[in-house]
């Protein structure tokens, strides 16, 4: 079920048809199941589609007047299907560092894309992670990245968002960026 809210300031909130388009420009017809006039100047449409959506794909919703909006993921993450398809039980999320390579892994099933940005030897780099099973994005860089600052650029619900690594313990001032740290070099004392 898709919920669409149209302002009555735009064609009186009326649309006789809706469809979606994915990132490959495939058209997906939508069926109006119900229509409600709301008190706040909007019309609420409940729409259905024949078939299933691919979680992580980005879809544009079109009305009959060619006005578009990005379909946003919200309630789908609370479904049994989502839990079955995207539960990830491994403990390798975040950064796995060795002096020869660093692997980045992020669980972001509703994201269209994830990139990592970092600075090495004064040069800014932005590299796309590859989508794998269960909504995990991963990338291995075959360089020594100890001490490097990094953050992720995630495209979800039609917007790019810069975020720090949710799996790391090492961040910069005010958590503005994450830091790759060789834990063996930290020499933490045991808690007494």
Stretches found by the model and what they are:
Residues 2-14, 108-110:
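A short glycine/threonine-centered beta-strand motif
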Residues 58-90:
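A general sequence property marking short-to-moderate contiguous segments
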Residues 12-21, 55-58, 119:
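Extended Gly/Ser/Thr-rich low-complexity repeat segments
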Residues 54-67, 148-156:
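Short, aromatic- and glycine-rich surface loops/edge beta-strands on solvent-exposed regions
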Residues 186-192:
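Conserved small/polar residues in nucleotide/adenosyl-binding loops
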Residues 48-52:
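Beta-sandwich interaction modules
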């Amino acid at each position: 079920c898709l919920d669409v809210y149209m302002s009555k300031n735009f064609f009186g909130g009326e649309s006789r048809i809706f469809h979606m388009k994915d990132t490959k420009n495939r058209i997906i017809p939508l069926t109006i199941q119900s229509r409600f006039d709301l008190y706040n100047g909007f019309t609420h449409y409940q729409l259905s589609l024949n078939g299933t959506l691919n979680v992580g794909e980005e879809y544009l919703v079109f009305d009959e007047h060619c006005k578009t909006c990005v379909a946003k993921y919200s309630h789908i993450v609370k479904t049994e299907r989502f839990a079955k398809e995207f539960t990830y039980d491994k403990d390798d999320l975040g950064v796995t560092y060795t002096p020869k390579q660093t692997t980045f892994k992020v669980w972001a099933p509703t994201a269209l894309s994830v990139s990592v940005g970092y600075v090495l030897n004064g040069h800014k780099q932005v590299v796309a992670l590859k989508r794998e099973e269960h909504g995990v994005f991963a990338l291995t860089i075959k360089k020594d990245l100890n001490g490097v600052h990094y953050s992720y650029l995630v495209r979800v619900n039609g917007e790019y968002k810069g975020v720090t690594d949710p799996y790391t313990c090492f961040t910069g001032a005010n958590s503005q960026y994450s830091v790759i740290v060789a834990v063996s070099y930290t020499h933490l004392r045991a808690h007494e």
